[in-house]
């Protein structure tokens, strides 16, 4: 025994073994460390080498005293061989470590006495089995043996079979991307413990972690023995739509969604799965201590409340708990940015692409093309193209070829008979408006400025020319079809597509005849309530015209077949949308009927309490209904046939509203749990879904049906 103490005093050994003498006192931590604060150089080198390999800064360790380094910064502080040890004494017994990283030869050894401060219970995680070999019983008072290989790997992407062999091990809380456990056969929830205590000396090393969010790793790994289980009330509040997918709970820890074949065991480093919210973990990043989350997302720290979601909760939202439970449901528009803030009105000339000043002669044009068409169409001069009638007409070359410019005007639907349709944002009657403004209030004048000029048009009305001219073009979703289909990827692409289409819906609505004469609040409300129905109706038409209603043609780069319908977890909604698309073929809807029905769909959902100028809205809606009836009568001379056709089209319009409501419910539930299923919501989509959609779901906003439901 005397010989062992002499060996312990010898420096330069490489084994790094430290053993606690039997006579050491454990009553006082400070007195104990004060008497045994000498650390060998080899032990320091071992600690530094392991810290560097893990990406931890060594500079922060050098400023601490030897006792503080041993207490707070030794990476082997908890006992690695078993579950956390709970002892009445303030410190755990010494861990017995054998280091092979610095191997100067067998027989040499250095023994030092030290004491380690344990972390909070439930945070002990073991290093990867192939990186560190650990042995020891999990009982109190036992010592574990830690063996280091010649090369310490930073992280390892293992398979599920390899992870299953070590699934009973308590993992040590380090930023290593460890292979997670196999997905459970049944849904479960894992309790997230309190975050690490950053008041200790460990904070200095944690601040320099290469991933920058070491404080956020409290949710990684498997649940500790003391995690417990969620209550029945907590379990019942989970929506069944977002719980399981093919026997797997949202994918592996850190996976961020489903993965294709061959990727089941691949796990990326944790630092690359967090959203870019900052370089270091903040206090607000941690959830409440008793918040429960699905087991598959324990490696994802819940998002802090985003700025686009309100912070005031309505009484009917009390059943939604979690980070999004305090969502504010807007009752007034004081805190909502106007939709013009996101979508400034932009109109381009259909002839040359310059900024359009309004609808001239039945088409959106600039002032230059308006004057050119008037002179060219009324004049008797014949224009001939010097080339092949395919000249480029743009803002800078529109004067080069009058023949091609005039031809493009006719192709855009410009006619001399459309002069009565004035600027789109301001449908003013010159003489009638001036005379009525002096004798009646402004509101009465505005009500007379509806699309009354539309009445009396012939079988090819100018109204249809306007609808064809302002119809939005093709919008792509930006979906990467080379990646395997997953729930998160498909729904994120749909949300991005919805954001892009919403921009076109706003521009299209503002170009509709009579729309700008609505009260500005009514304009915003009508768009925000009807956008879902408009997109569903337009998507059904695209599916009918492009793929014969066999699939859902959301965008050229996002077409849903049967597999994607199931993968998106909205199969029932997709089936109803496909049936709507098939109705276009069964009823033989013409493009003119579709355009007028789509415009009428914009004016088919309003608040129960009414709009600011409800009377004018009703008059405008009635004019669009008359236009639909006039389009029907153009090709049918039999009144009975016209009535039957009007009945069919209005029934089709009514069928859009239940589909839109189902999608409203789906998107709202998805927004509530978006941070758990890795689905991205653009800012404007999140704003409308969180503020306006609840009004529809709660019954404060209802659609207008043609027929009794």
From Swiss-Prot:
Annotated NR LBD domain residues: 458-689
Domain of life assignment: Eukaryota
Disordered: annotated span: 1-34
Interaction with LPXN: annotated span: 341-708
Binding locations of 17beta-hydroxy-5alpha-androstan-3-one: 495, 542, 667
SUPFAM superfamilies linked: Glucocorticoid receptor-like (DNA-binding domain), Nuclear receptor ligand-binding domain
PTM summary: Phosphorylated in prostate cancer cells in response to several growth factors including EGF. Phosphorylation is induced by c-Src kinase (CSK). Tyr-324 is one of the major phosphorylation sites and an increase in phosphorylation and Src kinase activity is associated with prostate cancer progression. Phosphorylation by TNK2 enhances the DNA-binding and transcriptional activity. Phosphorylation by CDK9 regulates AR promoter selectivity and cell growth. Sumoylated on Lys-191 (major) and Lys-310. Ubiquitinated. Deubiquitinated by USP26. 'Lys-6' and 'Lys-27'-linked polyubiquitination by RNF6 modulates AR transcriptional activity and specificity.
Pfam families the UniProt entry points to: Androgen_recep, Hormone_recep, zf-C4
UniProt cross-references to PROSITE patterns, sorted A to Z: NR_LBD, NUCLEAR_REC_DBD_1, NUCLEAR_REC_DBD_2
NR C4-type zinc finger span: 349-369, 385-409
Keywords: Cytoplasm, DNA-binding, Isopeptide bond, Lipid-binding, Lipoprotein, Metal-binding, Nucleus, Palmitate, Phosphoprotein, Receptor, Steroid-binding, Transcription, Transcription regulation, Ubl conjugation, Zinc, Zinc-finger
Sites of the Glycyl lysine isopeptide (Lys-Gly) (interchain with G-Cter in SUMO) crosslink: 191, 310
DNA-binding region: 348-421
Family: Belongs to the nuclear hormone receptor family. NR3 subfamily.
Domain free text: Composed of three domains: a modulating N-terminal domain, a DNA-binding domain and a C-terminal ligand-binding domain. In the presence of bound steroid the ligand-binding domain interacts with the N-terminal modulating domain, and thereby activates AR transcription factor activity. Agonist binding is required for dimerization and binding to target DNA. The transcription factor activity of the complex formed by ligand-activated AR and DNA is modulated by interactions with coactivator and corepressor proteins.
Role description: Steroid hormone receptors are ligand-activated transcription factors that regulate eukaryotic gene expression and affect cellular proliferation and differentiation in target tissues. Transcription factor activity is modulated by bound coactivator and corepressor proteins like ZBTB7A that recruits NCOR1 and NCOR2 to the androgen response elements/ARE on target genes, negatively regulating androgen receptor signaling and androgen-induced cell proliferation. Transcription activation is also down-regulated by NR0B2. Activated, but not phosphorylated, by HIPK3 and ZIPK/DAPK3.
Record's protein name: Androgen receptor
Organism expressing this protein natively: Oryctolagus cuniculus (Rabbit)
């Amino acid at each position: 025994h005397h010989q062992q103490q002499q060996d312990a005093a010898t420096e330069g050994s490489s084994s790094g073994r430290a053993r606690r003498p039997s006579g050491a006192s454990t009553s006082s931590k400070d007195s104990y460390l004060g008497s045994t604060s000498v650390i060998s150089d080899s032990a320091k080198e071992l600690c530094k080498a392991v810290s560097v390999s893990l990406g931890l800064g060594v500079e922060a360790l050098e400023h601490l005293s030897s006792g503080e380094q041993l207490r707070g910064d030794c990476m082997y502080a908890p006992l690695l061989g078993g579950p956390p040890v709970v002892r009445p004494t303030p410190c755990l017994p010494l861990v017995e470590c054998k280091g092979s990283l610095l191997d100067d030869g067998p027989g040499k050894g250095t023994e030092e006495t030290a004491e380690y401060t344990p972390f909070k219970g439930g945070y002990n995680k073991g290093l990867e089995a192939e990186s560190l070999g650990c042995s020891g019983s999990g009982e109190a008072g036992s010592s574990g043996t830690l063996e280091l290989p010649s090369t310490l790997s930073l992280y390892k992407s293992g398979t599920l079979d390899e992870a299953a062999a070590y699934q009973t091990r308590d993992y040590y809380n380090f930023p290593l991307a460890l292979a997670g456990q196999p997905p459970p056969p049944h849904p479960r929830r894992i309790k997230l413990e309190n975050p690490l205590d950053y008041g200790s000396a460990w904070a200095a090393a944690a601040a320099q972690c290469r991933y920058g969010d070491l404080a956020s790793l409290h949710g990684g790994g498997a649940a500790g023995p003391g995690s417990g289980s969620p209550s029945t009330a907590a379990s019942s509040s989970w929506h069944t739509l977002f719980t399981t997918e093919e026997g797997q709970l949202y994918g592996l820890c850190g996976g961020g969604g489903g993965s294709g074949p061959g990727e089941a065991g691949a796990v990326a480093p944790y630092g690359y799965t967090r959203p870019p919210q900052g370089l270091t973990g903040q206090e607000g990043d941690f959830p409440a201590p008793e918040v429960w989350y699905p087991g598959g997302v324990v490696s994802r720290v819940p998002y802090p409340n985003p700025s686009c979601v309100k912070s005031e909760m309505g009484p009917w939202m009390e059943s939604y708990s979690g980070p999004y439970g305090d969502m504010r449901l807007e009752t007034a528009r004081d805190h909502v940015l106007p939709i013009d803030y996101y979508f400034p009105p932009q109109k381009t000339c259909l002839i040359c692409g310059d900024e359009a000043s309004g609808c001239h002669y039945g088409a959106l044009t600039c002032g230059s093309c308006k004057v050119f068409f008037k002179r060219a169409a009324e004049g008797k001069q014949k224009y001939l193209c010097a080339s092949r009638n395919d000249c480029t007409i743009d803002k800078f070359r529109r004067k080069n070829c009058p023949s091609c410019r005039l031809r493009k005007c006719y192709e855009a639907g410009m006619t001399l008979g459309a002069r009565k349709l004035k600027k789109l944002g301001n449908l003013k009657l010159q003489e009638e408006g001036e005379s009525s403004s002096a004798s009646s209030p402004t509101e009465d004048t505005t009500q007379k400025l509806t699309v009354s000029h539309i009445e009396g048009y012939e079988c090819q009305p100018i109204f249809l020319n306007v609808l064809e001219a302002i119809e939005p073009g093709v919008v792509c979703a930006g979906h990467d079809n080379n990646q395997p289909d997953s729930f998160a990827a498909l729904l994120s692409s749909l949300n991005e597509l919805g954001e892009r289409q919403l921009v076109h819906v706003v521009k299209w609505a503002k170009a509709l005849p009579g729309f700008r004469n609505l009260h500005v609040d009514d304009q915003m409300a009508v768009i925000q309530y009807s956008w879902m129905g408009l997109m569903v109706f337009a998507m059904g038409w695209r599916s009918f015209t492009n793929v014969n209603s066999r699939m859902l043609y959301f965008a050229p780069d996002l077409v849903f077949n049967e597999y994607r319908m199931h993968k998106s977890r909205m199969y029932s909604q997709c089936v109803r949308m496909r049936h709507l698309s098939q109705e276009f073929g069964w009823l033989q809807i013409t493009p003119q009927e579709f355009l007028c029905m789509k415009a009428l769909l914009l004016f088919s959902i309003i608040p129960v309490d009414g709009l600011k100028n409800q009377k004018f809205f009703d008059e405008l809606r009635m004019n669009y209904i008359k236009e639909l009836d006039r389009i029907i009568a153009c090709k049918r001379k039999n009144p009975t046939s016209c009535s039957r056709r009007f009945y069919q089209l209005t029934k089709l319009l009514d069928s859009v509203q239940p589909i839109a409501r189902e999608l409203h419910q789906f998107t709202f539930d998805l927004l509530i749990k978006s941070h758990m299923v890795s689905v991205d919501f653009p800012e404007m989509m999140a704003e409308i879904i969180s503020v306006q959609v609840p009004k529809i779901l709660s019954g404060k906003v209802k659609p207008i049906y043609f027929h009794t439901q």
